[in-house]
Amino acid sequence: MSGELLNAALLSFGLIFVGWALGALLLKIQGAEE
């Protein structure tokens, strides 16, 4: 088992999760402003 492979998988998953969280937060903020 390669540590680099695990790091790459965690990094890509983390970026996807952060992007989803930011998108959901922006939608919630825009919905509250309207």
Swiss-Prot record:
Localization: Cellular thylakoid membrane
Cysteines joined through disulfide linkages: none
GO cellular component: cytochrome b6f complex; plasma membrane-derived thylakoid membrane
Transmembrane segments: 9-29
Main localization (coarse): membrane
Entry-linked InterPro entries: PetM_cyt_b6/f_cplx_su7
GO MF assignments: electron transfer activity
Annotated keywords: Electron transport, Membrane, Photosynthesis, Thylakoid, Transmembrane, Transmembrane helix, Transport
Membrane topology type: Single-pass membrane protein
GO biological process, one term: photosynthesis
Entry-linked SUPFAM superfamilies: PetM subunit of the cytochrome b6f complex
Keyword Membrane assigned: yes
Functional summary from the UniProt entry: Component of the cytochrome b6-f complex, which mediates electron transfer between photosystem II (PSII) and photosystem I (PSI), cyclic electron flow around PSI, and state transitions.
Assembly description: The 4 large subunits of the cytochrome b6-f complex are cytochrome b6, subunit IV (17 kDa polypeptide, PetD), cytochrome f and the Rieske protein, while the 4 small subunits are PetG, PetL, PetM and PetN. The complex functions as a dimer.
Annotated family: Belongs to the PetM family.
Name recorded for this polypeptide: Cytochrome b6-f complex subunit 7
Lineage: Bacteria, Bacillati, Cyanobacteriota, Cyanophyceae, Nostocales
Gene: petM
